[in-house]
């Protein structure tokens, strides 16, 4: 509601000066109290108040220190006095709103604000968490929780952004808890699953431990103290608490409050309702005057002037309806006047309607409660002391009640009787009885009676009343002590005896009993009643009358002091016997008539006070004190003549200042009590909604610009209201838009747009760690609303995106600048060594990644609301990395040639970028690749050359000794070194084997050179793999090159091993003394390892998967076949040597004849060793020991089996061929014995070594077995001594040779 004197009115078109009361002295700027140190600065200098002082520009700052500069002392004192007067006047209006609200209520659905944290509490929290991390608390926790707390402590609690947020008052304990909860949710999700323990349980446990650390041990013992006013401000406040709050807000002293409280009669609801009626009547009159004189505020269209008057009338009518809807009494279903709810109240709601609602006598029927308490009877002498007496009581027209019985010697009761009546002047009868003792007596005997005529003004205390006794009674002085208490209904505003004379009613001057009845909030009636009557004898509605004190009227007998009620065409004269009674009647009727004129009794008449002198003296005392303190002008000031737009601006500002300095993290939201008072003030005093929200926006923006945390949702509400109003959407039903409102709205819109853009540019610092929750998302939403041209047309997303993109570009510069300042990177870049520069850039990269991860974690909330937000955040990150590029390139350019220390930087950055879908292969990522492609290629080239050289030199010096522990025997080959990061790079380990090396040597006894080769190839491939090169083509090229390199290197290794194997075997002898040397087994194992490693090192994923792998596989397989063949050939040559020796015993040879003769001759005298047994035994030992050597030292079972298969088969073939050459000859006994033993032992030994039955029992073996069996049979017949137990038959008793 825009008051005629509001700030929307231009000074040159305002109402005349005499129509308003002036609060501001001429030439003095309107200013707020000194407590509001920012008021003058916040008010727009162009604000024009439609009254005196309203158009004066306000000073830059009202603080005394600033004001005192260039101002003399009298001017300064005048300003301070003016501020005090403004505060007091405001407080008068505020306490009236609190005392009798009829428009607003304290909202109960507002979100409860959390207690804010201060710097001392933050420091205490840091100490508590540090104590936990140092193990100084009793809280038991696992390592994972400790790591989470350590991260929270280092990243969050120690952050300067958190310190600033706490200092601004926008941080609560709940914010700290939510940040910790968000951190641990991510950690717990990454933990492995544990049977029987859900992750929700872990989360709950961690939160409970966090709460225990947060509270601290000493806080558990503290008892809560009494809550202060600041602490209960979030609750629904009582009137006393609201008074106290606004005393603090407006700087009002207790004494000033008490004086105003008494003077305003804040505890008198009738006076407050009457004050409201007077205010509303004054506003209607002012609206009519404005319409008549055609003096309006400037509106954006001429048609709005008439609409403005209608809005003023409608707003007052609404307030009247609100007031009318309030019940007259607090309750009581017996009150029958509620039917006049004024559905037909057009008489007083609509201007110009002279029709009145005529009340009937039945409309003003009252209801009273009477309490009659009978205490005792005195002077009872006519009956015996032991007789029973009792009393009855009745209100005429109602039921009778009786007391208990008592003895005549002690007639005391203390009995109370409760009655209800509708008679304002009831008749109460109390009778005293004694029980009749006569047999025929039908009724008890009446001893006395008393008839009383109480009123609501009668004494409530017990009094003695003389009783009327029957004739001839001895009780001449019979008295009864009783109390009659008659209540005063809430709608009965005053009552008593008055003389009256009127033209239409009470046409005869006489004394009557009058009652002032309030039928509804706007309908009062003056009624005269007779005894025992419910309806008034006569009544007069007070609507339209004006009451005032008058001088005595000559000729009217009765009454000492006079007053009258005057209305056009009617005058009613009243008279009272008592001055104080007259004052009370005039005050009551003054409230009822709603007149603006306040009656003041004549000075001389105040001296006439035959009764109630003490009451008048008290009133005079209050008036004197009030006058002494200069309060009268504030009470008597007409609200409709003051600039409430200006006053409300000060009130709202002071309230917001107080709110932001209380103990709650309010973010700019008022407390329920403050909202209630501001709502009530605006409704009651006609503050336009747009003006209220424009002022609120100004204040909130001012605080936000000064570092306070303000909820953007709050800004959005007020801005949306103002935008809707300015564009004619009538959010509060007001269709008029003033020029000033539109201009101020445009100014605020531009200022708000700049503020929001600045906040988005500083989002890491305005919304640290995503606090307040949802604030960034709300800010983006508000910015979108602010950028709209009007309220109906949505702005294209591209335009919003363009603005936000510009903000995020600034944000990238701001964030990176602050990060480099924190890391002090510029000093390092200017002076440090290349290694130090690289170290600093690596640290800076870690900080950059941390910043962007925090952005994603805490500021990605716009993702749900704005589809373009992730893209812009990615562009922001690219800008951020572009700034980092300058420092990175500087550091890399300073590195010496062929220095690989920069690879960890690539791995760090690449691992972050490749996992971000929006940054992967982005501008910075590609720049990073362009820098490191030559380094990677150069590194691989040098590694290839170094490995090739190590193979060449290694095989030249190779001893082929098996390597048991690679860490102790690898040669120290000079290779390009890469510092280790979390990744394994191709370096020679210094006497400690990496964990992944275990598979290379646990079952491997390869050579030093081969093991070194395989380790280097694997490490190089792991290094390149761990680079996770993002560009597929180059990554495939690297992989292909490394696979080809591995294939070539392994091929060279295999060929060198094959050559060395052949040379080694050539040097070995062919006798049964041959034992396979360890070097041969090592060579064998090298081929085995090459086979295994080729699968991993030479296999490609993709179309060429088999290209290198199959080639090297074929080479290895063929080489293995060759060396098996060479080894078998060597073993067979030993067997051939044995058979060659046996050939000397062939039948018909000279040596055979001599040998047979000598053996036979010698056998007669000595125990001659069995010829041929030494030869068989040495061969069998040769086979067995070489089998054991191969089985022990060659690691591949498959190759061993192949070797044994071929060895067995070839051995059997050689023996079979040897026998085939002697088909026509009978074997010598020694030949036969030796062969049988060799064949049988060979068969059994190879069967034990796992040679399969099919191979063992081949055709060759069958042929051999049959031949030897036949030879054995022939020998047993021809030789007398036989074969001495040697036979081809299987036998367990057979001698083991």
Curated annotation (Swiss-Prot):
Tissue: Highly expressed in cerebellum. Also expressed in non-neuronal tissues such as lung, spleen, testis, uterus and ovary. Highly expressed in brain. In brain, it is highly expressed in cerebellum, cortex, olfactory bulb, CA1/CA2 regions of the hippocampus, and dentate gyrus, and weakly or not expressed in the CA3 regions of the hippocampus, striatum, thalamus, superior and inferior colliculi, and brain stem. Not present in adult adrenal glands. Isoform 4, but not isoform 3, is highly expressed in postnatal and adult stages of cerebellum.
Disulfide pairings: none
Membrane topology per record: Peripheral membrane protein
Cell compartment(s), UniProt: Cytoplasmic vesicle membrane; Synapse; Cell projection, Cilium; Cytoplasm, Cytoskeleton, Cilium basal body
Keyword Signal: no
Domain MHD1: residue ranges: 886-1057
Domain DM10: 296-404
Purpose: Calcium-binding protein involved in exocytosis of vesicles filled with neurotransmitters and neuropeptides. Probably acts upstream of fusion in the biogenesis or maintenance of mature secretory vesicles. Regulates neurotrophin release from granule cells leading to regulate cell differentiation and survival during cerebellar development. May specifically mediate the Ca(2+)-dependent exocytosis of large dense-core vesicles (DCVs) and other dense-core vesicles.
Acidic residues bias locations: 1-19
Region (Interaction with DRD2): 756-1075
UniProt protein name: Calcium-dependent secretion activator 2
Assigned GO CC terms: centrosome; ciliary basal body; cilium; cytoplasmic vesicle; cytoplasmic vesicle membrane; glutamatergic synapse; nucleoplasm; parallel fiber to Purkinje cell synapse
Residue ranges annotated for the PH domain, each copy included: 491-594
Region (Disordered): 1-78, 1275-1297
UniProt entry keywords in alphabetical sequence: Calcium, Cell projection, Cytoplasm, Cytoplasmic vesicle, Cytoskeleton, Exocytosis, Lipid-binding, Membrane, Metal-binding, Phosphoprotein, Protein transport, Synapse, Transport
GO biological process: cellular response to starvation; dense core granule exocytosis; hematopoietic stem cell homeostasis; positive regulation of exocytosis; protein transport; synaptic vesicle priming
GO molecular function terms listed in the Swiss-Prot or TrEMBL record: lipid binding; metal ion binding
Native species: Mus musculus (Mouse)
């Amino acid at each position: 509601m825009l008051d005629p004197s509001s700030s929307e009115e231009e000074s040159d078109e305002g109402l005349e000066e005499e129509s308003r009361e002036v609060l501001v002295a001429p030439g003095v700027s309107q200013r707020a109290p000194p407590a509001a140190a920012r008021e003058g600065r916040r008010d727009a200098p162009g604000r024009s108040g439609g009254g005196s002082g309203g158009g004066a520009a306000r000073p830059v700052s009202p603080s005394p220190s600033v004001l005192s500069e260039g101002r003399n002392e009298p001017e300064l004192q005048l300003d301070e006095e003016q501020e005090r007067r403004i505060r007091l006047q405001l407080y008068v209006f505020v306490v009236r709103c609190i005392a009798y609200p009829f428009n607003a209520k304290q909202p109960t659905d507002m979100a409860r604000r959390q207690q804010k944290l201060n710097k001392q509490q933050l420091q205490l929290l840091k100490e508590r968490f540090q104590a936990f991390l140092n193990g100084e608390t009793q809280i038991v926790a696992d390592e994972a929780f400790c790591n989470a707390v350590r991260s929270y402590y280092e990243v969050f609690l120690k952050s300067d952004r958190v310190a600033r947020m706490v200092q601004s008052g926008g941080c609560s304990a709940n914010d700290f808890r939510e940040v910790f909860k968000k951190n641990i949710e991510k950690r717990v999700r990454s933990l492995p699953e544990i049977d029987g323990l859900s992750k929700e349980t872990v989360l709950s446990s961690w939160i409970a431990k966090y709460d225990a650390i947060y509270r601290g041990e000493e806080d558990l013992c503290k008892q809560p103290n009494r809550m202060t006013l600041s602490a209960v401000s979030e609750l629904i406040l009582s009137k006393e608490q609201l008074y106290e709050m606004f005393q603090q807000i407006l700087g009002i002293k207790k004494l000033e409050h008490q004086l105003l409280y008494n003077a305003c009669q804040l505890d008198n609801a009738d006076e407050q309702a009457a004050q409201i009626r007077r205010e509303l009547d004054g506003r209607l009159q002012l609206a009519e005057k404005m319409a008549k004189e055609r003096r309006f505020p400037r509106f954006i269209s001429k048609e709005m002037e008439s609409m403005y008057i209608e809005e003023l009338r409608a707003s007052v009518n609404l307030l009247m309806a609100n007031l009318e809807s309030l019940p007259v009494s607090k309750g009581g279903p017996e009150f029958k006047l509620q039917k006049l709810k004024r559905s037909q109240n057009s008489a007083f709601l609509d201007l110009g309607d002279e029709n009145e609602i005529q009340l009937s006598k039945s409309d003003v029927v009252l209801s009273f409660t009477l309490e009659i308490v009978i205490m005792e009877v005195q002077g009872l002498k006519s009956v015996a002391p032991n007789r029973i007496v009792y009393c009855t009581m009745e209100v005429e027209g109602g039921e009778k009640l009786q007391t208990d019985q008592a003895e005549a010697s002690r007639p005391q009761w203390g009995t109370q009787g409760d009655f209800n009546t509708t008679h304002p002047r009831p008749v109460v009868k109390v009778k005293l009885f004694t029980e009749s003792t006569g047999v025929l007596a039908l009724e008890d005997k009446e001893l006395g009676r008393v008839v009383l005529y109480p009123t609501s003004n009668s004494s409530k205390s017990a009094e003695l009343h003389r009783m009327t006794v029957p004739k001839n009674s001895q009780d001449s002085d019979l008295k009864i002590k009783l109390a009659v208490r008659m209540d005063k209904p809430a709608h009965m505003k005053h009552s008593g005896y008055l003389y009256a004379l009127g033209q239409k009613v009470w046409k005869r001057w006489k004394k009557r009993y009058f009652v002032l009845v309030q039928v509804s909030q706007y309908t009062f009636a003056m009624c005269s009643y007779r005894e025992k009557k419910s309806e008034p004898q006569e009544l007069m509605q007070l609507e339209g009358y004006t009451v005032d004190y008058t001088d005595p009227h000559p000729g009217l007998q009765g009454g000492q002091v006079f007053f009258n009620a005057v209305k056009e065409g009617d005058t009613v004269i009243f008279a009272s016997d008592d001055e104080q009674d007259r004052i009370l009647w005039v005050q009551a009727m003054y409230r009822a008539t709603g007149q603006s004129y306040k009656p003041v009794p004549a000075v001389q008449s105040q001296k006439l006070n035959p009764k109630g002198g003490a009451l008048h003296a008290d009133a005079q005392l209050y008036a004197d004190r009030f006058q002494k303190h200069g309060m009268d002008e504030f009470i008597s000031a007409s609200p409709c003549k003051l600039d409430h737009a200006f006053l409300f601006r000060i009130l709202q500002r002071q309230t917001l200042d107080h709110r932001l300095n209380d103990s709650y993290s309010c973010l700019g939201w008022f407390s329920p009590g403050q909202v209630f008072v501001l709502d009530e003030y605006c409704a009651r005093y006609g503050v336009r909604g747009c003006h209220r929200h424009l002022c609120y926006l100004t204040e909130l923006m001012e605080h936000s610009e000064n570092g306070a945390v303000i909820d953007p949702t709050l800004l959005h509400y007020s801005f949306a209201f103002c935008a809707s109003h300015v564009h004619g959407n009538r959010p509060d039903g007001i269709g008029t838009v003033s020029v000033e409102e539109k201009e101020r709205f445009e100014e605020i819109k531009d200022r708000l747009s700049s503020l929001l853009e600045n906040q988005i540019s500083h989002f890491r610092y305005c919304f640290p760690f995503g606090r307040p929750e949802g604030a960034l998302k709300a800010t983006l939403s508000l910015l979108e609303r602010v950028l709209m041209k009007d309220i109906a047309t949505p702005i294209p997303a591209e335009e919003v995106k363009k603005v936000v993109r510009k903000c995020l570009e600034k944000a990238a510069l701001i964030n990176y600048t602050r990060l480099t300042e924190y890391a002090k990177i510029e000093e390092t870049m200017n002076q440090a060594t290349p290694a130090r520069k690289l170290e600093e850039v690596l640290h800076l990269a870690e900080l950059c990644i941390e910043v962007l991860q925090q952005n994603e974690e805490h500021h990605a909330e716009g993702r749900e609301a704005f589809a373009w937000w992730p893209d812009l955040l990615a562009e922001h990150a690219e800008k951020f990395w572009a700034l980092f590029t300058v420092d990175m390139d500087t550091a890399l350019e300073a590195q010496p040639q062929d220095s690989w220390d920069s690879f960890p930087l690539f791995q760090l950055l690449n691992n972050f970028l490749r996992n971000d879908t929006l940054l992967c292969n982005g501008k910075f990522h590609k720049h990073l690749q362009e820098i490191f492609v030559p380094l990677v290629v150069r590194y691989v080239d040098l590694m290839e050359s170094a490995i090739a050289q190590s193979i060449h030199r290694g095989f030249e010096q190779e001893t082929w000794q098996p390597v048991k522990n690679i860490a102790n025997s690898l040669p120290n080959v000079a290779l390009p070194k890469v510092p280790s990061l979390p990744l394994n790079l191709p370096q020679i380990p210094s006497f400690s084997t990496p964990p992944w090396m275990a598979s290379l040597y646990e079952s491997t006894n390869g050579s030093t050179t081969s093991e070194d080769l395989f380790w280097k190839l694997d490490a190089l491939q792991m290094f390149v793999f761990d680079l996770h090169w993002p560009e597929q083509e180059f990554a495939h090229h690297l992989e292909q090159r490394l696979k080809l390199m591995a294939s070539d290197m392994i091929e060279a290794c295999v060929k060198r091993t094959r050559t060395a194997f052949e040379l080694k075997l050539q040097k070995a002898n062919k006798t049964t003394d041959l034992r396979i040397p360890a070097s041969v087994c090592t060579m064998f194992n090298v081929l085995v390892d090459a086979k295994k490693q080729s699968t991993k090192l030479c296999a490609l994923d993709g179309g060429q998967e088999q290209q290198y792998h199959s080639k090297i596989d074929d080479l290895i397989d063929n080489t293995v076949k060759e060396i098996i063949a060479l080894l078998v050939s060597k073993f067979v040559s030993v067997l051939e040597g044995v058979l060659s020796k046996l050939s000397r015993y062939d039948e018909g040879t000279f040596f055979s004849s001599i040998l047979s003769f000598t053996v036979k001759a010698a056998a007669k005298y000595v125990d001659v060793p069995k010829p041929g047994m030494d030869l068989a035994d040495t061969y069998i030992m040769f086979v067995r020991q070489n089998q054991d050597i191969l089985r022990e030292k060659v690691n591949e079972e498959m190759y061993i089996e192949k070797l044994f298969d071929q060895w067995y088969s070839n051995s059997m073939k050689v023996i079979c061929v040897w026998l085939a050459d002697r088909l026509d000859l009978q074997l010598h006994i020694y030949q036969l014995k030796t062969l049988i033993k060799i064949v049988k032992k060979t068969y059994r030994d190879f069967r034990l070594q796992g040679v399969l039955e099919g191979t063992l029992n081949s055709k060759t073996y069958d042929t051999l077995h049959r031949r030897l069996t036949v030879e054995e049979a022939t020998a047993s017949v021809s030789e007398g001594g036989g074969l001495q137990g040697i036979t081809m038959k299987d036998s367990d008793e057979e001698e083991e040779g």
